[in-house]
Amino acid sequence: MVMTVRVIAPDKTVWDAPAEEVILPSTTGQLGILSNHAPLLTALETGVMRVRQDREWVAIALMGGFAEVENNEVTILVNGAERGDTIDLEKAKAEFAAAQAALAQAEQGESKQAKIQATQAFRRARARLQAAGGVVEI
């Protein structure tokens, strides 16, 4: 049995297709959704969502948001999203390295705002790299 999964960002619909399973980066950890799941509303962290369709997994980088599960429909509203197969792996690696360096520098300073911004940029870069298939070592 399948469910309908939609990933909607402010600028586009990133995914709108049936799926057999979804794994979401919720604020309490990874959350697996199968068909006939109980109704649910949850907040999502910046991270990688995985969708299983026809025995193949598709990775999508999510930039935080919310997910609603009801009647075999999973609706995901996010601040931004990008399919892993559209992300340039080398560019994602470079962005991750730059974000990692910026975070290390921000942690040495005293500005809380700079630390928060660097942490958010790091999480976005990490999600994009993971979705593109890159290995992340922290």
UniProtKB/Swiss-Prot annotation:
One of its GO terms (molecular function) is ATP binding. It is a peripheral membrane protein. Keywords: ATP synthesis, CF(1), Hydrogen ion transport, Ion transport, Membrane, Thylakoid, Transport. CDD domains: F1-ATPase_delta. It is found in: Cellular thylakoid membrane. F-type ATPases have 2 components, CF(1) - the catalytic core - and CF(0) - the membrane proton channel. CF(1) has five subunits: alpha(3), beta(3), gamma(1), delta(1), epsilon(1). CF(0) has four main subunits: a(1), b(1), b'(1) and c(9-12). Produces ATP from ADP in the presence of a proton gradient across the membrane. Belongs to the ATPase epsilon chain family. This is ATP synthase epsilon chain. It comes from Thermosynechococcus vestitus (strain NIES-2133 / IAM M-273 / BP-1). The lineage of its organism: Bacteria, Bacillati, Cyanobacteriota, Cyanophyceae, Acaryochloridales.
